[in-house]
Amino acid sequence: MSGRVLITGATSGIGRQLALDYRRSGWQVWGCGRDGERLQALADEGIIPLQFDGRDSAAMAVIAADLPALDLLILNAGNCEYMDLAEGFDGALFARVIETNLIATGHALAAFLPRLASGSQLAIVGSSVSWLPLPRAEAYGASKAALDYLAATLRLDLATRGIGVTLIRPGFVQTPLTAKNDFPMPCLVTVEEASRAIMRGLAAGRHQIHFPRRFIWLLRLLGALPTGLWLRLGRTLISKGSPS
């Protein structure tokens, strides 16, 4: 199978690997990002580069107007910053993460959703963190939980137009973003493994894609614990300096 796919956040991590793998599979790929040098590296691989800031809705609208119909739209761009409540609630950090992970996704939907016709797919990359409240993840977790709800409502509303919606919820993936983490990351997978799991799930038309399985089951198990017990475990994680 081949077609046309646009991927945001394509200059690094999961997005970059997806762009490369879809291109190698014969797809026409548009890769989006802010970094000109990284976009040029994608262009050298046969990927069509689109440079814009995800917070710039006007720039996205101009770019989208020149695009053909898409078979697949993958909204992957995002960032993670952890909060240290010992210093107080950082409203500026919270706003930055919400703007990058949630508001920019809304801008991308406004710009690129009209390029999807009946039979096409929309994929939104959330996070497995939305299954379980983790320490210091007030901003990141809130932004990803909001994407869960967004994907669920879009799935209902776009079904009448014949557009499938998939929510992707990865566990820890070895990327430049997670390389900054200062805590253990169980069941860490490579970007190649993540890309394969995502491409398989999208090809199968799944509503949700989550991986790796062992980590997801662990999160679900912990999420089923009584709140009081999880609070005690959370305090232990905080005392050990994890992002809990």
Language model region names:
Residues 11-12:
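Conserved glycine-rich cofactor-binding loop
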Residues 127:
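Residue(s) in the substrate-gating loop at a strand-loop-helix junction
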Residues 109, 143:
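Active-site helix of classical SDR
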Residues 44-58:
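Rossmann-fold cofactor-recognition segment
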Residues 76-83:
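Conserved NAD(P)H cofactor-binding loop of Rossmann-fold oxidoreductase domains
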Residues 167, 183-218:
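C-terminal helical subdomain
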Residues 84-86, 90-96:
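Substrate-binding pocket helix/loop in short-chain dehydrogenase/reductase
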